[in-house]
Structure formats: structure tokens, C-alpha cells
């Protein structure tokens, strides 16, 4: 459509959730009445298929949602996410951006493909997730939709919830 605001939120597999957060904020601020959030990811083109620990966690996908004003107490009530910079090199695509591009290619062509150190990421999660969860649950969350593809990671989430007193939120995986 002509004259409609449109922009890209490049946040990899978390892009859809981040776009919903931005859209909800725009609606809440009165900038927009309705927002179409469209996400697509073609992970299969950037995976190393010889790395079974990583390639089995990712797939191609797409999703779309139309967001609009909600009644009081409905809609997206809260979003909590965090980034821990010490894990920046644990889940990367080294080449393909501005540092190692087509004019300054990397020495190893595999640098154009996604690489992940799953064990180190799990250790990072085990360090940061308990305080993150405590802060999240202070507000009486009923449902958690984690951004987690790993069965080990989801198991860790469930164990952390089981250790808490009182009713645990539903985990949608």
C-alpha cells in the first residue's frame, strides 16, 4: 500500500517477538491503530548440515499477525527479554555483514554459515536464567512462551519453575 510505514527488524529468530513488541508499543502510544507483523526465516540456507547439534534445532518458517487495540487487561500485557554480551560469540554467522563481506571474504567459506556453541550457551542460560525468571514472575505471569528450541533448555526452564513455591505458569513450547 502507498504511504504506509514499513520497516525491517533484523533480530534473527527472535525477530517476530521483537516486532510484536515494537508494534504493541506503537499501538499503545497511539501511533498506529493496526499493525501487520510478518516474519519469515530461511534458516536452511545458512546452516552447516554437518553440525547435527545445531542444524537439528532450526528450520525454515514464517508467521504473521495483525495487532490492534485491546480492551483493558487483554492483549500483550508484558514482554521481557534480555541479552548477555558475554555470549555474543556463541551463536554467530561470522561473515556476510559489513566486516567480512563479498569484497573482503573470510578465509574459511564456512564463516558464511551459522555456528553455535550449544554447551556454552546452556551454561550461560544456567547462570542468567534463574534471576531473569524471578524478576519475570514477580508480576504474576500465568503463561510463558519461551524462545527456546532445545529440549535441554526447556527442561531447565521447567526445573526452575518446579523449584518455586506456589502455582507455576503454563509453559507453551
Predicted regions and their residues:
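Conserved catalytic cysteine-centered active-site region
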Residues: 1-35, 159-173
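Acidic, glycine-rich active-site loops and adjacent beta-strand->loop/helix elements
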Residues: 11-16, 39-44, 82-84
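Flexible, glycine-rich active-site loops centered on histidine and acidic residues
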Residues: 24-62
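Condensing-enzyme catalytic core mediating Claisen C-C bond formation in acyl metabolism
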Residues: 49-123, 127, 131
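Phosphate/pyrophosphate-binding loops at sites that engage ATP/ADP/AMP, CoA/4′-phosphopantetheine
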Residues: 130-142, 161-164
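Glycine-rich phosphate-binding loops at beta-strand->alpha-helix junctions
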Residues: 141-160
Amino acid at each position: 500500500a502507498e504511504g504506509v510505514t514499513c520497516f525491517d527488524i533484523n533480530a534473527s529468530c527472535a525477530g517476530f517477538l521483537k516486532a510484536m513488541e515494537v508494534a504493541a508499543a506503537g499501538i499503545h502510544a497511539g501511533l498506529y491503530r493496526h499493525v501487520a507483523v510478518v516474519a519469515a526465516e530461511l534458516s536452511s540456507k545458512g546452516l552447516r548440515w554437518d553440525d547435527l547439534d545445531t542444524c537439528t534445532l532450526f528450520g525454515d518458517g514464517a508467521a504473521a499477525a495483525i495487532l490492534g487495540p485491546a480492551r483493558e487487561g487483554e492483549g500483550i500485557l508484558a514482554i521481557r527479554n534480555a541479552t548477555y554480551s558475554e555470549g555474543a560469540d556463541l551463536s554467530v554467522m561470522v561473515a556476510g555483514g559489513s566486516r567480512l563481506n563479498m569484497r573482503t571474504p573470510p578465509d574459511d567459506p564456512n564463516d558464511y554459515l551459522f555456528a553455535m556453541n550449544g554447551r556454552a550457551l546452556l551454561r550461560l542460560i544456567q547462570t542468567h536464567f534463574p534471576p531473569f525468571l524471578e524478576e519475570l514472575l514477580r508480576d504474576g505471569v500465568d503463561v510463558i512462551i519461551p524462545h527456546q528450541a532445545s529440549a535441554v533448555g526447556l527442561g531447565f526452564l521447567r526445573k526452575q519453575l518446579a523449584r518455586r513455591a506456589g502455582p507455576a505458569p503454563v509453559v507453551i513450547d
